[in-house]
């Protein structure tokens, strides 16, 4: 599957009796790919068992996902630091492993060839940066799990994930953009 920025994988049931469609981004590191693949397989199994009557990431899916992960966890496929985070995550999995900062950090650490970009949490408050495909922004304070960042052109505020990859701007003054 070609790389996507918005989601790691996808399950689409065929409601007309044909085969289901399951996709996973092919550019994910192996541990992340495996977790995403099992996540989507759990959606398929949940759909086959319960149909459309259950929430996509409800209790039924969570239980199915944990069951699907059991043989993988028993086989000790993951590195110890990733395994510990996956076990913690499996106690109450979120809709995306990207929503679990600790798990995402462990999965990214495995990938030695990761992006040369910094993450938002690595830059100082007040620093200017650009998210890929966005306008210049200024990092603000952390609010619960995300950072409040101001887009310089519009003054709009966005809540940005701490592990979002950013390009730091080396400027003397933010007025260089205005």
Go through each PLM region and give its residues:
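Metalloprotease/metallohydrolase-associated module, dominated by Zn2+-dependent proteases
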Residues: 1-15, 21, 27-30, 51-178
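Active-site recognition of the HExxH zinc-binding catalytic motif
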Residues: 35-48
């Amino acid at each position: 599957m070609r790389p996507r920025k918005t989601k790691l994988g996808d399950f689409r049931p065929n409601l007309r009796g044909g085969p289901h469609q399951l996709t996973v981004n092919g550019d994910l590191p192996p541990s992340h790919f495996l977790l995403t693949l099992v996540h989507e397989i759990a959606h398929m199994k949940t759909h086959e068992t319960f149909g459309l009557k259950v929430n996509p990431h409800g209790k039924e899916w969570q239980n199915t996902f944990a069951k699907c992960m059991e043989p993988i966890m028993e086989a000790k496929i993951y590195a110890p630091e990733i395994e510990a985070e996956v076990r913690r995550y499996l106690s109450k999995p979120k809709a995306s492993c990207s929503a679990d900062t600790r798990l995402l950090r462990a999965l990214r650490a495995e990938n030695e060839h990761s992006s040369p970009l910094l993450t938002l949490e690595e830059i100082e408050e007040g620093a200017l940066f650009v998210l890929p495909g966005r306008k210049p922004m200024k990092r603000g304070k952390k609010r619960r799990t995300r950072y409040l960042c101001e887009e310089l052109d519009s003054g709009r505020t966005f809540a940005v994930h701490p592990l979002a990859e950013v390009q730091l701007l080396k400027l003397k003054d933010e007025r260089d953009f205005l």
